[in-house]
Amino acid sequence: MDRNQQLFERAKHVIPGGVNSPVRAFGSVGGSPRFIKRAQGAYMWDADDRRLIDYIGSWGPMILGHAHPAVVEAVQQAAVHGLSFGTPTEAEIGIAEEICKLMPSIERVRLVSSGTEATMSAIRLARGFTGRDAIIKFEGCYHGHSDSLLVKAGSGLLTFGNPSSAGVPEDFTRHTLVLEYNNVEQLERTFAEIGERIACVILEPVAGNMNLIRPSAAFVQALRTLTQQHGSVLIYDEVMTGFRVALGGAQSLHGIQPDLTTLGKVVGGGMPIGAFGGRADIMNCIAPLGSVYQAGTLSGNPVAVAAGLATLRLIQQPGFYDALAARTARLVDGMVAAAREAGIPFSGDCVGGMFGLYFAADVPTSYAEVTASDRERFNAFFHAMLEAGVYLAPSAYEAGFVSAAHTDADIDATVDAARQAFARI
């Protein structure tokens, strides 16, 4: 039994399932998870001192790579002055100003401590602003683990959702309608029937929790048009895509200005942070100005803010996103070509520094299509890549991430490993 296995067995005695977030347990792919002891740049080292080329990047935040010197220095300097105050600070004004500058749809922004907290608060705010209860989300999209969003589709159109987790009362989900991603006709029919009841629509503007799925231009335009026509709030959940797919987030790629935006991951530079913001008239409904309550002991934590602000400044360097997108495309194109050489049905897609790999002949456009891909073959591929020192997401339904620290040599080594893995499976 290696050190990783020993730690996993030890963890299971004191931590449910041995992990603090389910996907880390390798339940989808089998085997024992890797316990990471340190990371630098594009690499992580596990408990057995095996170096891994990392394509998870803490599930998105590490856009600069691990332990970037400028971010580490910012954290160290902030920590010297105190870890938490429970008061306003000048630094939180600075990061708020930076967010508003980079995302013009955000006129006011509130800091929180996680992406889940951001989406939960945005939903509450939209309901308070509109005076309505019903919300729309889309099949396969993940918006954190708050009760009203842990919902699966009902039995038919206009049937409100059912809980997708034990412990969530049906009353929490009876106002949540789950529709198909990229289905414009279904969206139009729903608004025609109950548009006056819909408080908000929340969307992953590039879905990253059913692997990577792009929205069609017609779909996002229909969302913007219908929500405006019916007085509903359009929420872009950019916890994953914000500052990851483009400097202005996915909304800058779509040419769409949502009413509210949720952020996390990159905005914290690897530290726990989240944010939600948008139109001033909506944000002014939040306490202490308005009647929608939201609060947090660690909101605006000075150490997290320091990491986030350092990251936001670095990603504004000229050419940063062009280089990141080119490197990500090089990875995806190389892996698709390697699969083609092996005669394996396989496709890939990428947006900015996010990518998706699918054991299917064509890039999927919906939850149904992505779940129809060959999961068993993915699992075999995942383990072959892991043995070769490449750390991909341990699930066929999660996006991957490239950082600015990945080099062409890292990409080439990954493609070579994939070529050997495809030959084995």
Curated annotation (Swiss-Prot):
Which sequence positions carry the modification called N6-(pyridoxal phosphate)lysine?
A: K265
- Names of required cofactors: pyridoxal 5'-phosphate
- GO biological process annotations for this chain's record? protoporphyrinogen IX biosynthetic process
The EC number(s) this enzyme carries: 5.4.3.8
Primary location:
cytoplasm
Pathway listed for it? Answer: Porphyrin-containing compound metabolism; protoporphyrin-IX biosynthesis; 5-aminolevulinate from L-glutamyl-tRNA(Glu): step 2/2
An annotated GO cellular component of this protein is: cytoplasm
The protein's annotated catalytic reaction(s) are: (S)-4-amino-5-oxopentanoate = 5-aminolevulinate
Compartment(s) of residence: Cytoplasm
**GO terms for MF:** glutamate-1-semialdehyde 2,1-aminomutase activity; pyridoxal phosphate binding; transaminase activity
Name the PROSITE patterns for this protein: AA_TRANSFER_CLASS_3
Q: Which InterPro entries match?
A: 4pyrrol_synth_GluAld_NH2Trfase, Aminotrans_3, Aminotrans_3_PPA_site, PyrdxlP-dep_Trfase, PyrdxlP-dep_Trfase_major, PyrdxlP-dep_Trfase_small
Task: Please state what class of enzyme this protein is.
Answer: isomerase
Swiss-Prot/TrEMBL keywords: Cytoplasm, Isomerase, Porphyrin biosynthesis, Pyridoxal phosphate
Against HAMAP family, the record matches this protein to:
HemL_aminotrans_3
The annotated subunit structure for this chain is: Homodimer.
Q: What's the protein name?
A: Glutamate-1-semialdehyde 2,1-aminomutase
